[in-house]
Amino acid sequence: MKKSLHQIVILAAVILDIAACEHNNGNFSGGSTAAPGRGALLQSPPAIVATYAPAEFLTLLGGNSLGQILLQLSYSATCTVTVYHIEYQTVDPAGNLTPASGALMVPSGAGTCQGPSPVLLYAHGTQADRNFDIADLNANGNDEGLIMAAVFAAKGYLVVAPNYVGYDTSTLRYHPYLDADQQSKDMIDALAASRSALPTMQVPSTTDNGKLFITGYSQGGFVAMATHRAMQAAGSVVTAAAPLSGPYALAAFGDAVFEGEVNDSAVENLTLLAASYQNAYGNLYTNSSDIFAAPYASDIATLLPSTTALSTLESNGSLPPALFSSTPPSAAYAAETPALTPANLAPVFAAGFGPTFLVTNAYRSSYLQDAAASPDGGFPAVTNGLPPAGPSNALRQALKLNDLRSWGPTAPVLLCGGNSDPTVFYFDTELMRDYWTENSPASVVTVLDVDSAVSSNDPYASLKTGFAAAKAAVRLDAIVAGATDSGDSAVLADYHARLVPPFCLSAAKSFFDTYN
């Protein structure tokens, strides 16, 4: 297939990005005294946050809801792990240099815990907390940092996990949420800075063996895939990747939400997304009231991420409980206010509508009219499976620009998720799989639905059985506590954030081990 001019321009830009990153890390000689460039380590050596012996992981996991599920999978730690807080230089969406931070987790000990080790680059999921620091494994809300240290670093992987621009020590007032270009640069720069920090003074025997694995969950699944795409385009080595439960088919996902399939974190998601794309492209709205209802329009551009807890923002009225009005924009959209199928997710969709809502009916109507005029090929019906050909709505244009149905991997990929996910719908995984089957048949892609039946000679039988048992335990606990819906609501509440991650991350670890 011939490359379009657009693809060639992207390829050239990415190559220049990587080259600039390498140049600024000392791979080229020169006497410039300019400020540190992309990928530069801003604090050398990086600060040590904590060191954890193998036995300590059992205690930490036992006090964590995700960790408790991991322990049920016969988990054991092998290596001591030293966690460093890294600070590095990256760029904002406009290409301006900006500082960011993250974690570097270094294993040590005997055997595979020392010497040349594989690198695991991890992209975390959606965070509303501006102070989020994945290097602080003891912080409330940092399940991902703990799980990455336990599943990968304590098993001999060097783990690099950026916080992203907009969090922790970052000076940017917003987060470039689901901005494929900026977020992939952030990941690449965190990786470059971490590699320059190795070997560390604390663990001098652990080095990078040249093998790179990329994974991420939820928002991080999207970021992981965008990063893989960017690195592949630049000719950088990626050994294997495992994007997990991510919104890869972003244009289809956006259409699904506006057409009544409102996911369970839609208010938070759209608040972050609007700030991201308005800052990146400048054309999402002229005034925030073009999209958002009063009284939310005035503060929405800088509301998230916040140092105020998301629950407080919801309880004090800074954010509404619903995304859309329960009154449809017109009678033509009554069947989508809310959507009723698939039936198991109908209660989630219904919760996205109410008398107090974020998005005006006028804006929802204009979005839906554009979706009808230029439909996505993957939603509501699967036609060609491609993003919309010519959207005129600015949000739909931005979603198409960041949609990942545009490339094919040359390194092995595992896609993992659960078919009843109420947060990131599983059709994202299916559309990505189908796109690659049609457009990149040489790609080596494995797809795992942890919520599916065990098949004959199923290599993931134990994970599927474990997931079913974990889901049944949530149901039972809910019923014992008085639930009258057979525990359905409890399962949906835990599905994306608690039930799926330990199983998909365990699958990713096994997948990567085969290429290590």
Residue ranges of model-derived segments:
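Catalytic-loop region of hydrolases
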Residues: 23-115
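Primarily recognizes the serine-hydrolase "nucleophile elbow" in alpha/beta-hydrolase
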Residues: 192-265
